[in-house]
Amino acid sequence: MANTTSAKKATRKIARRTIVNKSRRTQMRGAVRTVEEAIAKGDRDAAVKAMTRCEPELMQAAQRNIIHRNAASRKVSRLTQKIAKLAK
């Protein structure tokens, strides 16, 4: 339990930030899921369209320290490779 007023305030700030970060993480995961579903169906056009929405979501999450920037780049790279395989 926080004793000082600054520690109590920090606890409140963390709680607010956690809610925002969870929301952004959920939004990011949903964007990734739509790309993966389109890839699973074999629908290249839908996958490309979903990827144009997904990539900025991942990069913004990395900028806001919700996920690591290397993790975001790795996810984008792997999804892009899967989409490229659909073209063949």
From Swiss-Prot:
Coiled-coil residues are none
Name its species. Rhodopseudomonas palustris (strain BisA53)
NCBIfam families with a match to the protein in the record: S20
- Family listed: Belongs to the bacterial ribosomal protein bS20 family.
One Pfam entry for this protein is: Ribosomal_S20p
Q: Does the keyword Lipid biosynthesis apply?
A: no
Q: Which GO terms describe its cellular component?
A: cytosol; small ribosomal subunit
Please cite one Gene Ontology biological process associated with this protein.
translation
What name goes with this protein? Small ribosomal subunit protein bS20
**Biological role:** Binds directly to 16S ribosomal RNA.
User: Which controlled-vocabulary keywords does the entry list?
Assistant: Ribonucleoprotein, Ribosomal protein, RNA-binding, rRNA-binding
